[in-house]
């Protein structure tokens, strides 16, 4: 489907460009304007240059991923690559979906060996986030994840990625868990929804847990409302459109400053424990720690509905306060 006509003035484009550039969406921004007159503007050229750089980085990432899989397999470890390249490969150009590290999932009994591999000199420069469990898919066993995974081409190497249903659920819950502050996360879901195969098993994706199903459907609803994602399964689409109005408003509020530096813990001025000895600045920093309502809902295992979010936000604060106090008491 051709893109819709773009109604954006040069001034509006100039205002939007820093948000695109700093939020990781510069490549997507260029892709959208590359066939319009905006490509000739200074902002258009800035996004074009960013796209070229992202294309180079995508090639470097692919080379490193191939190396990591060779190193792991040489030690008898078979990993699954999550997020990052596993999603970027589905875009028209890998440069449209930048990422910084490589999330690798391994069976628990392989973790020690896998950790030794990524700490080795041979893996130097490969930034790996190694997992032996996936919190977002806590109700799914490692063996089921591997049984449903599949091998795909990454250059001259076969790379293992999650099954479509597992990966969609992971990406959806990960987005909500982190407050949906990064726009590209929702673009990922939109891409997956619109390119979904006819045999995609929604029952498997939603799982048997009603809370997990609620979370995944909430993310689907956001993808429909905010990035215009369409989908073939009309029953799921109807269920997803029942998301509460506050949810989309909260995401748009986050997108006003979609930068990693504005997210916890980087947005915190000092570790909370430091205020126990030096309380100056405590109250001003406390305001920066008030939780995003989306993040708060997931953190206390709540549901996305029309009820007020204040109880969930207070619950999140109590959880964090408990984590702060209990280790201190144990040390005493």
Walk through the language-model features, giving the residues of each.
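Conserved NTP-donor binding/palm subdomain of two-metal-ion nucleotidyltransferases/polymerases, i.e.
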Residues: 1-100, 106-332
């Amino acid at each position: 489907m051709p893109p819709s006509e773009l109604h954006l003035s040069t001034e509006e484009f100039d205002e939007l460009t820093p948000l695109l550039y700093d939020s990781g969406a510069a490549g997507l921004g260029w892709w959208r304007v590359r066939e319009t007159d905006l490509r000739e503007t200074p902002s258009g050229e800035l996004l074009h240059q960013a796209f070229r750089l992202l294309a180079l980085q995508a090639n470097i990432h692919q080379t490193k991923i191939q190396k990591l899989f060779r190193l792991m397999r040489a030690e008898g470890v078979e990993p699954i690559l999550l997020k990052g390249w596993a999603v970027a490969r589905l875009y028209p150009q890998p440069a449209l979906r930048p990422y910084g590290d490589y999330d690798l999932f391994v069976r628990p009994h392989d973790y020690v060996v896998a950790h030794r591999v990524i700490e080795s000199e041979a893996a130097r420069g490969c930034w790996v986030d190694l997992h032996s469990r996936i919190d977002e898919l806590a109700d799914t066993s490692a063996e089921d994840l591997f049984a449903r995974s599949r091998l795909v081409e990454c250059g001259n190497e076969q790379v293992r990625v999650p099954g479509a249903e597992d990966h969609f659920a992971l990406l959806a819950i990960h987005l909500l868990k982190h407050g949906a502050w990064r726009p590209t996360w929702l673009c990922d879901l939109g891409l997956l929804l619109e390119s979904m195969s006819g045999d995609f098993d929604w029952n498997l994706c939603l799982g048997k847990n009603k809370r997990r199903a609620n979370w995944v459907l909430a993310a689907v609803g956001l993808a429909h409302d905010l990035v215009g994602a369409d989908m073939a399964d009309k029953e799921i689409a109807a269920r997803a459109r029942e998301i509460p109005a506050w949810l989309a408003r909260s995401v748009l509020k986050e997108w006003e400053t979609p930068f990693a530096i504005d997210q916890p813990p980087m947005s915190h001025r000092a570790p909370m424990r430091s205020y126990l000895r030096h309380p100056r600045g405590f109250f001003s920093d406390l305001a920066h720690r008030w939780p995003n309502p989306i993040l708060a809902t997931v953190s206390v295992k709540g549901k996305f509905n029309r009820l007020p979010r204040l109880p969930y936000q207070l619950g999140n604060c109590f959880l964090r306060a408990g984590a702060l106090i209990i280790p201190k008491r144990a040390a005493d």
